[in-house]
Amino acid sequence: MNKPTDTKMKRITILLIVLLCVMGFSEFKKDKSEVRKASVSTTAQRMEQQGLVNIKSVDPTIKIALMYARTDNFLKKMLYKDLREAYFLPRCATSLKKAQAELKRLRPDLSLIIFDATRPMSIQQTMWNAVKNTNHYFYVSNPKNGGGMHNYGMAVDISICKASWNEKLWKDSAKACSIDTIPMGTKVDHMGFESHIDKEQQLLAKGILTKERFENRALLRRVMKEAGFTPLRTEWWHFNLCTRAWAKANLKVVK
C-alpha cells in the first residue's frame, strides 16, 4: 500500500542528489576560477580581456625571461611591476609555436626564449621618455606615432637558449640572472651598431662578430622567418609579424 509513496520519495531523493551535485560542481568551477584569477596578475588579466593569450597556453616549451620585469635592461629599472608572462595576439602566438617547432627540428637541444612580448602603451611612453632626447631615440617607437608592434601584440624580442635551461632560475629581482643563451655578439637590448643585422658582414670581417655568433643570429632569423616573422634592421632580437601600417589600420593598441 505504501509503494506509490516510496516511489515518490525515491524520486525526490534522486532529484535532491542531482541538484546538490550540480550546485557542488558549479561552486567547484567558481572556486577554481577564483583561484586562477588570484594567481594571474592584474596586467595579465587586462591583456586577456583585450584578446591576448599567454604563450605558455599555446606552447609551454618556449622559455620566458621578461627583461623589463627586472632591472638588468637599458633603463636599469623594473618596468613591469606585476607582469611575468608573455602575451600575444593568438595569430602571433601560433606563429611563435611554428618557429619553436622549426628550431626543434633543426636543433632539438635548443629553445626559443622570449625577453619581451606585448608591451602596454604606458610602458612604451616610459621608455620613450628615457630616450627621446638621446642618440638612442630611434631604438624606441614614439607613442605619438602609434608606438611599435609590441604595442599591438604582434612583435617579440627573442633569442635562443639551451633547452635544458631551467626557467625557475629566472627571478624578478635586481640581482644578475644567468640565462643559458647561445652567443649572439651582444646582449638583448644593446643599443649600438653591433646589434644591427645590416652591419653583420662588416662586423664579421672586422672580427667584432665571430663566425659562431654570426651563424647563431642566422639560425634565429631562419626559424623566425619560416614562421612568418620579419626581422628589425637595428635589433637582431626583434621580430614583427605584420607591418606598422597594417597594425594601425586593423588592430587596437594594447593599454
Predicted segments, located by residue:
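Bacterial Sec-dependent N-terminal signal peptides
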Residues: N2-E34
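Segments that shape or occlude catalytic/ligand-binding pockets
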Residues: P120
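Extracytoplasmic cell-surface/polysaccharide-interacting catalytic and binding patches
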Residues: E27-A117, M127-A130, T134-T234, R244-K255
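Conserved metal-phosphate-binding beta-hairpin within the catalytic cores
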Residues: F239
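Short, well-ordered surface patches within globular domains
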Residues: I123
